[in-house]
Amino acid sequence: LSAEYGRRISLKGGSFIEPQIELIYSHLNGVDYTGDTDYVGRKMHVRQGAMNSFVSRLGVGFGQETERGTWFLKASLYHEFAGDLSTDYSDGFTPKSTTQRGRDTWVGIQFGGTMKLNDRTSLYGDFEKTFGGDIKTDWRIDAGLRWSF
């Protein structure tokens, strides 16, 4: 579940600047499972707790709009406010618990654009890279064909 607000401010010659804010909530259910161990007749029991994530994004985009399409460059600051994950393990004798703290802050840089093929169809694509957080996205590519009806 997410909510995003941005406002495109037009500049001269088709250029624009676009400040943005976004809030993203997600939930992953917990799960229990059992697996085999190296010990004869022993099973490993694992209980993965549920996880709630709440991320905010504050960004600004710069771009150029033409008759044939749009290109942009966007920089965003992300912060995870929750995202803690707890897991319990047991081989029947020695229980162990671990917790990962999900709170983190990172920066994302995105470059992309849209090219109009006709009034109803366009190609789009963008490249994204993140910096500074515990989990990094070396490069992510999103691309597609958009058809409006």
Task: Pin down the residues of each PLM region.
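Membrane translocator/pore-forming domains, dominated by Gram-negative outer-membrane beta-barrels
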Residues: 1-149
